[in-house]
Amino acid sequence: MWKMERNTNNILDIHTHKAEPVSAGKAIINRKLATDALCEGYFYSAGIHPWDLTEFDTERRLECLREQLAEKQLVAVGEAGLDKLAAAPMQLQVAVFKEQVELSEKYELPLIIHCVKAMDELLALRKEIG
């Protein structure tokens, strides 16, 4: 089994919309799925995407995310971030993003960041959060 080491100094872009199917080996899956249906050797990330935010069920979604963090196959938090094209108010996006940053740090998991037209805000948050 491989071990992930915490390294907060590097930024790695793993974003893709056109991934080739995995024919052998291990795969990282980043989408909505039922964790009990996962096969051994498959890993996933979980997060609250800015496009999926509403003011009405945010706490429920955060609670679901907290519960998933105990799963051994969850290897990253995200996609989480800021998106000026999303319908959710920026204030809500920032609050939920901060919560996900805290969770990724608490569980020592990488954070997959989504950022659209909000790089200045994201960098300001990085300075604020540390």
PLM feature spans:
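Mid-domain alpha/beta scaffold segments of enzyme catalytic cores
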Residues: 1-130
